[in-house]
C-alpha cells in the first residue's frame, strides 16, 4: 500500500488486518463531477469563501469534519490494481458499513470502541478469506468475527473509522493549496481545492462552514462525504452470531 508523500495532503489510507484488503488513494485531479467546471468566484458577492485562501478554506472544512458527530463516506478506491468499494458511516465512537471487492465478495464492518467485527459473504470467504475448506466457508458465512480494534494491524482502519482521526491524518495545518473551479457534485455547487505540490483535489461546499463533498483520486478512485451529523446508532451483533477471531488466526 502506498504511503502519502510530502505534499499529498488528501491521501487517505484504508486498511483491514490480515485479510489482504487494502485500499489507498484519494489524491488527483479529474473531471468526475456532474457538470463542467467554471472559474472560482473572485469577489465576495454570493460566495462566502471568496475572501479566504484555499488553505483557510481547507482548514475550516477539516475542523468541521473533526467536529462532526457522524459522516457517511462512499466510493471506489484502487490499490495495486484491485478496486474496493467502500460504504461507511463514521462517528467518534466507531463506524459501520461495507467494503466490497468486485468479483471477490464483500464484508460488513462494525467498530464500537475497542472492538471490531467483520462479517464476510460466501464469495469473500471463498476468494479472499484465506480458506478453501468448503465446510469452514459455510461455517464462517454469516458469522461476525470479533477482533481487537487496538491491534497495530488495524491502526489505519481505526483512523478511517473516526472523523476526528481522519481529518487529523490530512497532515496538520493546510498549506500549498490553491482554488480551482466551481462545479456541481450530487446536486451541490462546490469549490475545488487543488494541492500545488501534487495532483490531489478536494471539493467543498460553498458556505460559511465548508464541508468536504468529495476527495478525488482520479485513477485511484474517490470518496464522497455526505450526511454530516446524521443520527448514528452502533449496536454489537448478537452473541449467537459472533465468534472469536483469534481462534481462526485473525
Short names for language-model regions:
Residues 171-178:
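A short, amphipathic edge element
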Residues 181-242:
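Gly/Pro-enriched, hydrophobic low-complexity segments
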Residues 119-166:
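Acidic/charged, solvent-exposed loop-and-adjacent secondary-structure segments enriched in E/D, K/R, S/T
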Residues 34, 168-170:
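Extracellular/mature segments of secreted proteins
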Amino acid at each position: 500500500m502506498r504511503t502519502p508523500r510530502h505534499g499529498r495532503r488528501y491521501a487517505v489510507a484504508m486498511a483491514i488486518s490480515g485479510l489482504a484488503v487494502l485500499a489507498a488513494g484519494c489524491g488527483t485531479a479529474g473531471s468526475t463531477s456532474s457538470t463542467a467546471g467554471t472559474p472560482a468566484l473572485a469577489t465576495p458577492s454570493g460566495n462566502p469563501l471568496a475572501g479566504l485562501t484555499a488553505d483557510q478554506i481547507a482548514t475550516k472544512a477539516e475542523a468541521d469534519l473533526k467536529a462532526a458527530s457522524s459522516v457517511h463516506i462512499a466510493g471506489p478506491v484502487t490499490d495495486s490494481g484491485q478496486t474496493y468499494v467502500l460504504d461507511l458511516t463514521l462517528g467518534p465512537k466507531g463506524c459501520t458499513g461495507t467494503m466490497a471487492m468486485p468479483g471477490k465478495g464483500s464484508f460488513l464492518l462494525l467498530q464500537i470502541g475497542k472492538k471490531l467485527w467483520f462479517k464476510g459473504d460466501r464469495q469473500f470467504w471463498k476468494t479472499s478469506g484465506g480458506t478453501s475448506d468448503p465446510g469452514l466457508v459455510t461455517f464462517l458465512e454469516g458469522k461476525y468475527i470479533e477482533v481487537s480494534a487496538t491491534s497495530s494491524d488495524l491502526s489505519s482502519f481505526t483512523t478511517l473509522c473516526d472523523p476526528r482521526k481522519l481529518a487529523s491524518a490530512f497532515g496538520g495545518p493546510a498549506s500549498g493549496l490553491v482554488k480551482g473551479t466551481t462545479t456541481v457534485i450530487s446536486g451541490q455547487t462546490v469549490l475545488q481545492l487543488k494541492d500545488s505540490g501534487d495532483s490531489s483535489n478536494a471539493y467543498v461546499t460553498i458556505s460559511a462552514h465548508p464541508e468536504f463533498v468529495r476527495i478525488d483520486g482520479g485513477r485511484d478512485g474517490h470518496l464522497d462525504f455526505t450526511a454530516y451529523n446524521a443520527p448514528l446508532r452502533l449496536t454489537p451483533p448478537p452473541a449467537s452470531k459472533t465468534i472469536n477471531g483469534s481462534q481462526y488466526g485473525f
